[in-house]
Amino acid sequence: MLRTSGLALLALVSAVGPSQASGFTEKGLSLLGYQLCSHRVTHTVQKVEAVQTSYTSYVSCGGWIPWRRCPKMVYRTQYLVVEVPESRNVTDCCEGYEQLGLYCVLPLNQSGQFTSRPGACPAEGPEPSTSPCSLDIDCPGLEKCCPWSGGRYCMAPAPQAPERDPVGSWYNVTILVKMDFKELQQVDPRLLNHMRLLHSLVTSALQPMASTVHHLHSAPGNASTTVSRLLLGLPRPLPVADVSTLLGDIAKRVYEVISVQVQDVNECFYEELNACSGRELCANLEGSYWCVCHQEAPATSPRKLNLEWEDCPPVSDYVVLNVTSDSFQVSWRLNSTQNHTFHVRVYRGMELLRSARTQSQALAVAGLEAGVLYRVKTSYQGCGADVSTTLTIKTNAQVFEVTIKIVNHNLTEKLLNRSSVEYQDFSRQLLHEVESSFPPVVSDLYRSGKLRMQIVSLQAGSVVVRLKLTVQDPGFPMGISTLAPILQPLLASTVFQIDRQGTRVQDWDECVDSAEHDCSPAAWCINLEGSYTCQCRTTRDATPSRAGRACEGDLVSPMGGGLSAATGVTVPGLGTGTAALGLENFTLSPSPGYPQGTPAAGQAWTPEPSPRRGGSNVVGYDRNNTGKGVEQELQGNSIMEPPSWPSPTEDPTGHFLWHATRSTRETLLNPTWLRNEDSGPSGSVDLPLTSTLTALKTPACVPVSIGRIMVSNVTSTGFHLAWEADLAMDSTFQLTLTSMWSPAVVLETWNTSVTLSGLEPGVLHLVEIMAKACGKEGARAHLKVRTAARKLIGKVRIKNVRYSESFRNASSQEYRDFLELFFRMVRGSLPATMCQHMDAGGVRMEVVSVTNGSIVVEFHLLIIADVDVQEVSAAFLTAFQTVPLLEVIRGDTFIQDYDECERKEDDCVPGTSCRNTLGSFTCSCEGGAPDFPVEYSERPCEGDSPGNETWATSPERPLTTAGTKAAFVQGTSPTPQGLPQRLNLTGAVRVLCEIEKVVVAIQKRFLQQESIPESSLYLSHPSCNVSHSNGTHVLLEAGWSECGTLMQSNMTNTVVRTTLRNDLSQEGIIHHLKILSPIYCAFQNDLLTSSGFTLEWGVYTIIEDLHGAGNFVTEMQLFIGDSPIPQNYSVSASDDVRIEVGLYRQKSNLKVVLTECWATPSSNARDPITFSFINNSCPVPNTYTNVIENGNSNKAQFKLRIFSFINDSIVYLHCKLRVCMESPGATCKINCNNFRLLQNSETSATHQMSWGPLIRSEGEPPHAEAGLGAGYVVLIVVAIFVLVAGTATLLIVRYQRMNGRYNFKIQSNNFSYQVFYE
């Protein structure tokens, strides 16, 4: 939107058509814009007047005296420039507005209007936040920038005066703009121009109403767009439909605006938008709200409000569940007979992130930041008061500290000011140096957004910088040892001189500051490497799954040391040690109810008997890697003694493993994490111990037997195991996990259940469980478990890459470079939705092998996300066909199902049969349930079981989609996850825009949900009905010239329109939901095709339009004569190079029009040194360019002698083109009779890529002017000599004829006279 006015002018002319090309003022303002006024302007203009002047000239007088000269009066006409006043009407911005591009906006000095937030600054109030500001947009949420103590700080606005009538009407307005958000930030860093343009458009469209507009948020949209959200206030309520109609005019008049959506705002959710007092109930209305006292009800309220309360009990059992790195769930109880509406608010510090109301007693929050402390306040109105309670929650993360001492800088006042230019430059350079020092695995985390780095403080001496590194779900064990390699590159920095002694990597101690952890005030905070855990000091922990957060009961008397009840060993008092690089010990505190203290190295502690049986011990981090809940809860009468029980050991990642001895058990978990936990919240199945009280009489050193094994919660990264076993003294279980893709993992536990996470998706794991006691090994149980993922196998043959022996070595640089190019090219050709799945890890591509012939790449596709397998396969096949730089042989490229049954990679138990399906398999129980001691909880053995395809994905589905802001998911306590959500038409239909046809895919689940028969569906005409059908989708296709499909084209876009209908019924009566949905595909006409470097001749390029709806595929080919030019071809100055640019797939009514072609000495199409040879679709004079055809067919051709007017030895060619569709009233042919150069302001922004180059042939100096050869020089000299000789001969002959010929020879007969002859 903020591009140059000339660019937008050309775009708008293209959009409205040539007939409206005059719709602009002389200043470039669009006549379709707002706030335009006519002004009478008087100014001086220059005009030319003809004036006759006389002067005296002396000429010859004539007569006998030739030198005599006489005066003569001579008259001549002179043209003088004079300035005269002229008045005329000029269309310009109205008073109070100024021009910005094509439109009129408020000036920047009125930023208080277009950057303001609702409400007013409080006259008196609490201390503001520490965030300094200059404008309201610098503050989070709805806070305002208010003056306070000589400065300006962010503060909560003052509440409005209470009124009985609605004081205003508020709406959410979402505007989608044709501008890439990153480009917008580059040209407008603070978005001030963007805000004032949106403000002017909205307020002008609603005139004469006095509206107020507040900018809330701008973010990147899909396919190079920007989404802006505004808060619109009107003086009186209007229906949402009326406001939407008024604002919809913006999209019709402003080319850069794609759409405008309007929604009602629930003013009751935001204290800043309603004036209801604490004793009143706020009732939301469309466009407004109503404040209701206890004695009255709103007459216009859509529902009856319960205004009487009998009791006001407090909110109890307020706990947090399912805490992850970006989400959590809160639940509570209220012992009341009334139905209450709860108001839940989430704060980050003093910033209000979200406010919501719900009638349930649970709420899920997603889209949060990792490692951040949040405060959740839940309240309800009762007995005329606000009954509330507050809970503190910190999202999971691993946090580390990096301290850097820089000696070549001094700490100054400007460096302490975070708004100064010096601080910005210093922080940017420092963070860049640290980022460059990251090892590869940490660098990948940083680029993927899973590692957040921030400067915490700057201290003197010279400059000591404290960095805080927050890691979210790294996917592998993360510890200080992982970050330690950054120290050596930092010390070698060329920008900063770093002191080795003052630079270190260490753990971030959350326990030092209460603002860094969420432990209860009645709990100890115990620091761990990368995280922390909490330990209640009371007699009861209300949430054992998150220990130390909700402590109840009496406090245990604090003591300096405690006596172990079993061993009598005195242990020292509790400490909060900090794990740093090189430390191997950790701090462990006793469980609730036991003496306080921490065992020293090599010591053991013995808890009292636990009242639970068959429980699970937490012996490692969970999959969120927080270390919380590391507290141990031992079974029944188990006793922990040093000789017989293993001692805890810590691997470099901070994971605590239990082994018999360190010498014999050094196998680490590597990427696999062990989590033994209670099964309550997670839904895992733990089997009870089969022993009774008599089982305690089992001999102490006899391994127990293992009974039935239950496998549950199988996801793409882990699963849960539980097994039956007798209870015995000194008995442990050893688990061995092996797979073909990772080393074996050995772990020991005394529990009968374990949860494994951090595994690779779609991998078959062999599990062995063995009971041990006193060094003796018992019976072994074996089973197979395959992590969930659908799998495809494929092969692609690449013609223009030669096979190298180095490809046999996967670690060689050539192999890695080729894979990097392959992945980058394939990803760049995938649609945006598929790229999002790949970025989120929902779809993974793994190269299995690279073999000869030319290059054959075999790969696997792992599909974890809830996306159709055929859609993934089709997307990758299309990407292979259109991938740039790589020439793919289509006939030898395929993607097919991966047969797990044939390859024996299924986990079906003996007695069941494996049946292969597309992307997965099923286990069928023929003849009843198998008699096998392994049971899969998600596989009911009744005929054909649902199999992997059913249970592999459901546990992975999140409650909400993580975004940039917190989002609420309203619900109650955990419910069964297998119930499918109801689909709407938008979510069930996917439109695939292809050249020459439109394809619509509809989910069958939606058709079954709405009872819509497949036979009733068609596109515009009944002949274009369902063409393909599988188990999940139906497909409908319509060609561009079939079934009444409409095609419209202008200078900018080609739009194909059809309609999805389902009113086709053989009986003539429709008994189902009727669908009448318009469908359109937009293709961008303006394309840029460049010639640049490639591995082989020819390039296919996909240029998507701004909406990503469709694309045209272009091809550029170079010839000399009829022979195509290979890569890096050399041509001479006299060679005519013929260039063809056109569409890859032929369509008779689509024409290609070249608009501009130029050459550059580098592969950068935007190189400042350019040589234009086609401009405004016509050849530029004196460039030896001849246009053969342009606008006549689906390809354009021209010839040129490129090195006849360019002195460089290497050039790259670039061309812009547009796609044109001929109609009876319009032609695409170009007329170059009235040629003019296209001005810079008329260029159009297009996508770019390079290919080439062309090289001047050897023997010609790169900078020599084009000259004549030696042969031509000889011919010219001879011709000149002949011409001179002939001219001399003619002159001599003429001279003789005019003067006669004299003969002085004496005649012999008469020698007395000389005879004269003429």
From Swiss-Prot:
All ranges on the Cytoplasmic side of the membrane: 1294-1318
Residues the record marks as carrying a glycan: 89, 109, 172, 322, 335, 417, 585, 713, 984, 1050
Keywords: Calcium, Cell membrane, Cytoplasm, Disulfide bond, EGF-like domain, Glycoprotein, Membrane, Repeat, Signal, Transmembrane, Transmembrane helix
Cellular component terms per the entry's GO annotation: cell surface; cytoplasm; external side of plasma membrane; extracellular space
Disulfide bonds: 37-94, 61-70, 93-104, 511-525, 519-534, 536-551, 901-914, 908-923, 1157-1215
GO biological process: adipose tissue development; cellular response to gonadotropin-releasing hormone; regulation of gene expression; regulation of granulosa cell apoptotic process; regulation of ovarian follicle development; regulation of reproductive process; single fertilization
Fibronectin type-III domain residues: 314-398, 702-791
Domain EGF-like: 264-313, 507-552, 897-938
Signal sequence segment: 1-21
Transmembrane region(s): 1273-1293
Positions of the SEA domain: 396-510, 788-900
Stored SMART domains: EGF_CA, FN3, WAP, ZP
GO terms of molecular function: calcium ion binding; peptidase inhibitor activity
All residue ranges annotated as the WAP domain in the record: 114-158
Protein name in the entry: Uromodulin-like 1
Lineage start: Eukaryota, Metazoa, Chordata, Craniata, Vertebrata
Gene name of this polypeptide: UMODL1
